[in-house]
Design a protein with these regions (language model features):
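Aromatic (tryptophan-biased) beta-strands that constitute blades/sheets of beta-rich domains
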Residues: 2-14, 46-57, 112-121, 166-186
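Mobile, glycine-rich extracellular loop/lid and propeptide segments
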Residues: 1-6, 10-42, 51, 159-160
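Phosphate/diphosphate-binding loops
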Residues: 132-183
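Acidic, glycine-rich active-site loops and adjacent beta-strand->loop/helix elements
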Residues: 54-55, 83-84, 120-121, 152-155
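Beta-propeller blade signature
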Residues: 1, 36-45, 96-111, 157-165
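Repeat-blade elements of multi-bladed beta-propeller folds
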Residues: 16-37, 60-92, 102, 127-152
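Short, solvent-exposed loop/turn and secondary-structure capping segments
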Residues: 8, 41-43, 50-52, 80-82, ...
């Protein structure tokens, strides 16, 4: 194809993404490493709105770089997020570091976060979710589940109800070993 000079700024938009954009109705959905989902008019390139992955926070990082999936019927974008920064040192970012190392669902119609599921709280091990989310209708024992699936660096398969972010199966969290780093809380 040819560059459309009337789209955005002489044929391009600034989105800082490494994830392929998705077409949604008359819009282009871009997942930005600046920690947001941005929606642009597909004809003009004008930004219609953006939804931030993180509100107020005490950390950096958590960028959605691993991939995204769009459920056009439900008008929901699912993303996976990176770990908080600095990656291996969390003294200056206490707490869970919400929405990092997570699967996050964005409601494009309501323009907000629908739900988030955090795989690793206060990630100190670079265990962010690096594989794109997969949307799949899965039949288990005769019952159909609308799921979003993500594979993790720890070898886990996260299987969630894509409507509410609840796990399909029971899961068990484990406490991390106590850190040897002064003032670090695991």
């Amino acid at each position: 194809g040819k560059l459309d000079k009337f789209f955005g700024n002489n044929g391009s938009i600034s989105s800082l993404t490494i994830v392929a954009p998705m077409v949604y109705n008359d819009s282009l959905v871009s997942v930005s490493i600046m920690r947001s989902v941005d929606v642009f008019d597909i004809n003009s390139g004008i930004k219609q709105f953006g939804i931030s992955v993180h509100g107020e926070r005490n950390f950096s990082g958590g960028a959605p770089w691993g991939g995204a999936a769009l459920d056009k019927t439900k008008e929901i974008v699912y993303i996976v997020t990176g770990n908080p920064l600095p990656s291996l040192y969390g003294v200056n970012r206490p707490g869970e570091n919400k929405n990092t190392s997570s699967i996050v669902a964005f409601d494009l119609k309501k323009r907000n976060i629908l739900w988030a599921f955090q795989d690793v709280n206060h990630d100190l091990w670079d265990y962010d979710i690096a594989s794109p989310p997969i949307i799949h209708n899965l039949e288990i024992e005769g019952k159909l589940f609308e799921t979003v699936i993500a594979l993790t660096k720890t070898g886990n398969v996260i299987l969630l109800d894509r409507n509410n972010g609840k796990p399909i199966f029971d899961l068990r969290y484990r406490k991390a070993p106590i850190s040897d780093v002064p003032n670090e809380i695991t």
